[in-house]
Every structure is written in C-alpha cells, then in structure tokens.
Amino acid sequence: VTLEGFRPSSYLTSETARLQETVGNGKAIAAVSGGVDSTVAALVAKRALGERLLPVFIDTGFLRAGEPENVKARLGDPSLGLKVKLVKAGGRFLEATKGEAMAEEKRKKFRETFYQVLGEEARKDGCDFVVQGTIAPDWIETQGGIKTQHNILEQVGIDSLSKYGFRVVEPMSELYKDQVRVLGRHLDLPKDMSERQPFPGPGLLVRCIGTVSKKKLDLLKSSTMIVEEKLGPFNYDQYFAGVIENKFAKEPVYKNLDETAAGALGLPSSETRVDVFEDRVTGVKGETRSYGRVA
C-alpha cells in the first residue's frame, strides 16, 4: 500500500474486524511506549476490544527523564482514554544487560527481558494476547541483519506462545512510518504525538555505547534533555545524544587516517590528529549493516 493509496478509514475497519476475530472474547495487553507506533496500535485495539484491552508501559530504566510518568498521564487523557498500567523494571533490565558491550547482544538481552516481563503481566491479568506497534521497517531491518528490533519475534522464528505464554497481534506490521502517522491523525492523535520523532524500543541502552552503567545512563538522560530542547524547534528528521567511553584504541586501526582527515578538512597533515575510540557502534552502509569504531 503506497501513501497515496492508503485509506486510513478502510484500514481501520479491516484491522478492527481482524482483531475482534483473533482475540474473540479474550483479553489483550497493549505494549505502549508513548511513541507513535505503539500508541496508534493501542488506539486501533481499543476500538476493537474496548475494556478488554489493558495498555501496559514497562519502565526499562532506559527512557528519557520523567518519561514513564509523562506517558502514563498523556495516554490516560480522556481524549485518548488509554488507562496505562506502569510496570517498574529498571533494575531488572540493567542487571540483564550489565557487562555487555556488543550492540546486537544488548538488543537481544533487552528483547528477552522485555517479553519475560510482558509475559508475567499477561498471566497476572489473564491476557492471552499482546498487541504491539510493529511496522514494516522493524522486521525488514531485523531479517536483513541490519539490527535486531526488540519487537520482532515470529518473523525470526520465535514462538511467543510457547516461550512467553501469549500470542502477538500486530495491526500495523505492513505499514510504514508515514502511513502510521496518517492513521494516527485519522484517530485524532494530537500532532505532537503523531509526528513525534522515533525513539528506539531499547531506548537509551543503544545510545549508551559499549557497556552500560548507571553513571553513563544518568549522563545520557541529562544530555538527551539538552539536545532535544535545543534542536527540537528545527524539526530535523532525527537528532539525539550518545555517550561513549573516553578510551581510544592503542594501536592504529586504519592506515593513513590522519592524512585522509587532513585532506577532507583542507589542513596540513602536521596539524591533524585523529583518535579512534575503542568501543564500536552500529551504522548502515548502503543497505547493509556496519559495525565499527568511531574516529
């Protein structure tokens, strides 16, 4: 479905019917984060299931300062009507990812902990289904090996029912971000929410380069607040802060790096020095994943 051919009213009608058929007389949890994808998915599910939908927000500890409480209040506004259950699990996520420096492994450990917590909440509330805001780029990036998106399970062979005790329902798994925003506006989602800048599911965990610690997280939360406050008014597509250890590789990593940088900057090589950090970051070259050091 192209953006030009996307009809939010028709899509909403078909997905509402599909959700009702899938869940039947049962109950479902909606995993919400405050982002546009999970919020729109929850609103679609709310139309289909009414009071049989329980929105759950997991505080992973990797969120912006004050975000859990802000999201709960915002989604609970009468205009949206999503009564969110807030689950505090920051210590558990920090312990699960402690000592891990590799970005992909951090994402996988986050995913495992996230769904363990969701499964526990589903059992507590008698829910057999979890509704989440997976969109097409999530499973495309995961299957393509670019990076593991934490909300991808069945597309990579993980049976959520046998492993976590619930079935996943994804009402927007074939949509792209622009289409989700159109659907959000159709559902009267406020503009600051429908147009909100993407924030990764694992949150600041993946912007904390290398191993994660409370000290680095606290610094990243304060830095994120400053960056978003200063750059927000310019409406850039994306901007964010990251934290990396101030440790550099002891041996040369790339040949002639100083000369290359000098040429790019138009400076004499005698006046140019390039240091390369020890920790590695994830990037994309062309359409393939790249994992390397930062200079």
What are these regions (language model features)?
Residues V1-A295:
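ATP/NTP-dependent adenylation/nucleotidyl-transfer catalytic domains that generate, transfer
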